[in-house]
Amino acid sequence: MLQPKRTKFRKVHKGRNTGLAHRGSTVSFGSIAIKATERGRMTARQIEAARRTISRRIKRGGKIFIRVFPDKPITEKPLEVRMGNGKGNVEYWVCEIKPGKILYEIEGVNEDLAREAFALAAAKLPFKTTIVTRTVM
């Protein structure tokens, strides 16, 4: 599972996921990519599940680039615990996703196979996505 090796602070505020993704919104490493069209959160488990789905579909064909990393800790209080008495313990890590963010890229496989793999991976994600290709200028 992906998570930071060390962080400056153990717990963070909830915050708001607003705006569009300007950084990480172009295909940089591969030839075809999957891009988020809605905002949401992607847990480390979801990142890994989608990665495994893509890699199983393309087998040994190409290279997968993961463009997201879960760097935000999410806390939960134990069951049947009264409110108050501080913030809960860190349970899992998420990555805040804004519309336009590139999630995964593939290089070295034909486009049909890559689209198939991304379609399977999109079913594992909690928001709508689209498939984009690199534009050469």
From Swiss-Prot:
Physiological role: Binds 23S rRNA and is also seen to make contacts with the A and possibly P site tRNAs.
| InterPro entries with a match to the protein in the record | Ribosomal_uL16, Ribosomal_uL16_bact-type, Ribosomal_uL16_CS, Ribosomal_uL16_dom, Ribosomal_uL16_sf
Which Gene Ontology BP annotations are present?
translation
Q: What name is this protein filed under? A: Large ribosomal subunit protein uL16
Q: Family per UniProt?
A: Belongs to the universal ribosomal protein uL16 family.
Kindly state one GO CC term assigned in the UniProt record: cytosolic large ribosomal subunit
Per UniProt, the keywords (alphabetical) are: Ribonucleoprotein, Ribosomal protein, RNA-binding, rRNA-binding, tRNA-binding
**Gene behind this protein:** rplP
One GO MF term on file is:
rRNA binding
List, alphabetically, the SUPFAM superfamilies matched: Ribosomal protein L16p/L10e (SSF54686)
How does this polypeptide assemble, per the annotation? Part of the 50S ribosomal subunit.
In the UniProt record, does the keyword Amino-acid biosynthesis occur?
no
Question: What CDD domains does this protein's entry cite?
Answer: Ribosomal_L16_L10e
Q: A Pfam family for this UniProt protein?
A: Ribosomal_L16
Keyword Iron assigned to the entry: answer is no
